[in-house]
C-alpha cells in the first residue's frame, strides 16, 4: 500500500469519526431522544422537527445498539450510554405483546399501534441488549440478549406462530442474513453454542440455496431447494442487501483468521452485488434489479436509498482488507464520494434517505419508521475502524 493510499484511509477514518461525534449523534440526541417517555422518535424533518410521534420498535433496538456501540467504539460518552439504556427500557416496558412477540410500531407513550409477521424488532432488541452489556459489563443484559435470540428462534420454528406472508413455499434472504449479525454481536458478550451454530447454518444456507450461479446473485427468495421462483418477486435482486450479507460473512471470516471458504463466499457475493447494483450512468447503488433483466416491480426500483450506499462503503473496505486488491479501494472511493456528494446534508446535518436515480433529493426528511440512527452511524463507526486498521 502506498503512502498516498494510507493517507486517504486515515483521512476517511478521521472524517467518519468527526461526523459521528459532531453531527450524527448530536442530531439524534437533540431531535430524537424522548426525554419524557423514554426511547427515541425517528419521524423527523430535514431540520430535525418532529413530524410524527409514532415510534418504530425496530429503532428502539437499533438506537439502543447504535448509542452503546458509539460508546464502545468511539467515545465514552455517558449520555450515549444512558440513551441506549432508555431505549432498551422502553422496549422491555412497552414493546412486547402478551405472546412474547414484539410490536412494529407504538405510540409515544408505548401503546401498541401495529404488529407484523416478522421478528426484526426482536433482532434489533437483542443486539441492543448485547452491545449495552458489552459497554457496562452487565451479565444480566447479556443473558437478556440471548433470551430474545432464543425467543426469535422459537417463533421462527413454531408452525403458525408467524403468519406466512405468501402461500409460496421457499426460503428468504432477509432473516437468514440478519441472524448472522445478531449471533455475531451476541457472541462478543456471551458464550452459547447455538450462536456459532446459527452463523454456520445461515452461511451454509446462503451458499447452498440463495446464491445463484446462473444469474450471479443472491436472490431475495427462492424455492425450498434453492429453485428460482420465476415471478417478479422471485427474480428480485436487492444489491444493498447482498452487499450487507457479504460484509457480515467477511466479518465472520476475519474473526476466524480469514477463513478461506468464508472469505471466498463474501467476496463472491460482494462482486456479484456490485455488478448488479452500481449505476454506471448516474453512480450509486440502485435499489432493485430483476435477475432476468425485466423491469423490477417495486416502484422505488431505480431510486438510490441511503442504506445501500452505507453498506457499499463498509463492504468495499472489508474486501480490501481481505485481499489487498486495489480495485476494492477504488470501489470504496467511488461509493464514498458519491454518498458524500448526494446524501450528506452539509447544511442541516445527517443524511437524506431517498434520492432519485440521478442523485437528486426525492424528499428531505431525515427519518421515518424505517430510517433513523442506524445505517449511517454504523457505517461511520465501522468504516472508521476498518480504514484505520488497514492503514496501519
Regions found by a protein language model. Give the residues of each.
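Glycan-recognition and catalytic cores of secretory/periplasmic carbohydrate-active enzymes
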Residues: 1-392
Amino acid at each position: 500500500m502506498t503512502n498516498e493510499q494510507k493517507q486517504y484511509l486515515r483521512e476517511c477514518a478521521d472524517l467518519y469519526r468527526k461526523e459521528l461525534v459532531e453531527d450524527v449523534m448530536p442530531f439524534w440526541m437533540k431531535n430524537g431522544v424522548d426525554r419524557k417517555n423514554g426511547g427515541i422518535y425517528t419521524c423527523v424533518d430535514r431540520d430535525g422537527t418532529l413530524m410524527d410521534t409514532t415510534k418504530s420498535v425496530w429503532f428502539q433496538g437499533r438506537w439502543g445498539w447504535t448509542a452503546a456501540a458509539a460508546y464502545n467504539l468511539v467515545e465514552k460518552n455517558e449520555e450515549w450510554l444512558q440513551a441506549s439504556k432508555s431505549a432498551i427500557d422502553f422496549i422491555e416496558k412497552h414493546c412486547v405483546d402478551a405472546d412474547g412477540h414484539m410490536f412494529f410500531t407504538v405510540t409515544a407513550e408505548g401503546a401498541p399501534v401495529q404488529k407484523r409477521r416478522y421478528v426484526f424488532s426482536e433482532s434489533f432488541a437483542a443486539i441492543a441488549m448485547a452491545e449495552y452489556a458489552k459497554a457496562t459489563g452487565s451479565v444480566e443484559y447479556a443473558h437478556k440478549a440471548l433470551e430474545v435470540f432464543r425467543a426469535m428462534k422459537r417463533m421462527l420454528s413454531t408452525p403458525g406462530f408467524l403468519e406466512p406472508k405468501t402461500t409460496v413455499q421457499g426460503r428468504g434472504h432477509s432473516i437468514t442474513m440478519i441472524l448472522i449479525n445478531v449471533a455475531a454481536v451476541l457472541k462478543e458478550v456471551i458464550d452459547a453454542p447455538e450462536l456459532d451454530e446459527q452463523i454456520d447454518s445461515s452461511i451454509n444456507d446462503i451458499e447452498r440455496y440463495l446464491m445463484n450461479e446462473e444469474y450471479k446473485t443472491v436472490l431475495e427468495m427462492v424455492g425450498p431447494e434453492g429453485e428460482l421462483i420465476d415471478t417478479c418477486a422471485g427474480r428480485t435482486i436487492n444489491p444493498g442487501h447482498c452487499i450487507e450479507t457479504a460484509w457480515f460473512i467477511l466479518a465472520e471470516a476475519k474473526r476466524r483468521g480469514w477463513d478461506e471458504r468464508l472469505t471466498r463466499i463474501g467476496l463472491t457475493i460482494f462482486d456479484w452485488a456490485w455488478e448488479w447494483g452500481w449505476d454506471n450512468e448516474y453512480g450509486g447503488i440502485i435499489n432493485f434489479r430483476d435477475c432476468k433483466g425485466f423491469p423490477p416491480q417495486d416502484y422505488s426500483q431505480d431510486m438510490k436509498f441511503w442504506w445501500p450506499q452505507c453498506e457499499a462503503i463498509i463492504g468495499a473496505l472489508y474486501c480490501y482488507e481481505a485481499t489487498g486488491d486495489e480495485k476494492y479501494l477504488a470501489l470504496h472511493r467511488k461509493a464514498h464520494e458519491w454518498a458524500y456528494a448526494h446524501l450528506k446534508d452539509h447544511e442541516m446535518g445527517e443524511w437524506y434517505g431517498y434520492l432519485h436515480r440521478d442523485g437528486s433529493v426525492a424528499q428531505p426528511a431525515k427519518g421515518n419508521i424505517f430510517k433513523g440512527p442506524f445505517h449511517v452511524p454504523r457505517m461511520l463507526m465501522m468504516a472508521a475502524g476498518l480504514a484505520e486498521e488497514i492503514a496501519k
